[in-house]
Structures are given as structure tokens and as C-alpha cells.
């Protein structure tokens, strides 16, 4: 009898986080998407120096693409390296892509990436969300509300 090999469970490692998106947008429905990468991009992502704070997703020919995301060049790749700001294809079901593109076209919403991470199987995933842009006064209101909730929690903790 052969012993079964146990697959090594990798923890979910967040590579890039778009914290600014939660401040600039009202986040709606969140989706998980795969991302089509080249080999050097995967290795560069594992170093953890990618940024997505200025990136967005958009539909093109029935496909969803991630634009303006920055994955630095992999130092050991020499001439076979990738372009750091190239558009990257997001892998989702057709129904999900259709839902996102309809929301963008009809309701004026935006598709923003929230984070890039490696799942338990070691595959790169992108968490994208439907979002509506906030005005300056909405941002101030959100900050006030967050501060009030923090003060309220502090008071409840001290009293109770």
C-alpha cells in the first residue's frame, strides 16, 4: 500500500491591499476573481511589492481586465521579464462579468480591486468590488461616523 501524500496547506497570504478604496468608494458586492499572470509576475508578486491603489477593472470584448496595477519586474528574470503596468485578464464566470459590466454601464458604478492574495492552493486571486464613488462631503461624514463609533465603543468598554 502506498501512503497518501498530504498536500501542504498554505496560509492565505495578502500581497497587495487597496485600503484607499474603502475610503474613496462605497463598497457594494464583492467578488473573487482569478488573474492571468506570466511566470515572472507570480514570482514578483510573492515578494509582496505589488500595488493596486490606482488600479481599476473594466470590461473589453466580454472579458474583464485589471488596468494600471503595478507588479514590479522580477530581478532574476533578465530579458524574459514582464511589463510592470500591463493590463491583466481577470478570470470570472460569464454571468459575473455580465453583472459587473451592466452595473458599470447603467448605474455608473466602478469595479475596484480590494486586494491581491494567494489562496490555500497557492493561486493568485483578486478581490474586486462594485463601488460607487464618494464626494468630498461623504468622505468627511464617513470619518466622523467612524470616529463616533470608536468613541462609543471606548465609552461602552470603560463603563461596562
From Swiss-Prot:
Gene3D superfamilies: 2.40.280.10
GO CC, alphabetical: cytosol
Positions of transmembrane segments: none
Main subcellular localisation: cytoplasm
Key words of the record: Cytoplasm, RNA-binding
SUPFAM superfamilies: Small protein B (SmpB)
Disordered as annotated region, ranges: 134-160
Any one Gene Ontology BP term: trans-translation
Any one GO MF annotation of this record: RNA binding
Subcellular localization(s) per the UniProt record: Cytoplasm
Keyword Zinc part of the UniProt annotation: no
Family, similarity comment: Belongs to the SmpB family.
Function: Required for rescue of stalled ribosomes mediated by trans-translation. Binds to transfer-messenger RNA (tmRNA), required for stable association of tmRNA with ribosomes. tmRNA and SmpB together mimic tRNA shape, replacing the anticodon stem-loop with SmpB. tmRNA is encoded by the ssrA gene; the 2 termini fold to resemble tRNA(Ala) and it encodes a 'tag peptide', a short internal open reading frame. During trans-translation Ala-aminoacylated tmRNA acts like a tRNA, entering the A-site of stalled ribosomes, displacing the stalled mRNA.
Protein name according to UniProt: SsrA-binding protein
Species for this entry: Azorhizobium caulinodans (strain ATCC 43989 / DSM 5975 / JCM 20966 / LMG 6465 / NBRC 14845 / NCIMB 13405 / ORS 571)
Lineage: Bacteria, Pseudomonadati, Pseudomonadota, Alphaproteobacteria, Hyphomicrobiales
Gene giving rise to this polypeptide: smpB
Amino acid at each position: 500500500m502506498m501512503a497518501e501524500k498530504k498536500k501542504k496547506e498554505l496560509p492565505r497570504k495578502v500581497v497587495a491591499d487597496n485600503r484607499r478604496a474603502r475610503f474613496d468608494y462605497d463598497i457594494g458586492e464583492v467578488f473573487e476573481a482569478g488573474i492571468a499572470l506570466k511566470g515572472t509576475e507570480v514570482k514578483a508578486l510573492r515578494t509582496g511589492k505589488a500595488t493596486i491603489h490606482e488600479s481599476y477593472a473594466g470590461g473589453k470584448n466580454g472579458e474583464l481586465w485589471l488596468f494600471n496595477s503595478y507588479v514590479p519586474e522580477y530581478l532574476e528574470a533578465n530579458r524574459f521579464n514582464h511589463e510592470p503596468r500591463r493590463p491583466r485578464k481577470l478570470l470570472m464566470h460569464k454571468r459575473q462579468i455580465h453583472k459587473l459590466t451592466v452595473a458599470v454601464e447603467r448605474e455608473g458604478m466602478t469595479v475596484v480591486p480590494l486586494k491581491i492574495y494567494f489562496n490555500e492552493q497557492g493561486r493568485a486571486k483578486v478581490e474586486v468590488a462594485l463601488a460607487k464613488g464618494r464626494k468630498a462631503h461623504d468622505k468627511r461624514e464617513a470619518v466622523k461616523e467612524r470616529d463616533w463609533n470608536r468613541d462609543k465603543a471606548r465609552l461602552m468598554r470603560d463603563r461596562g
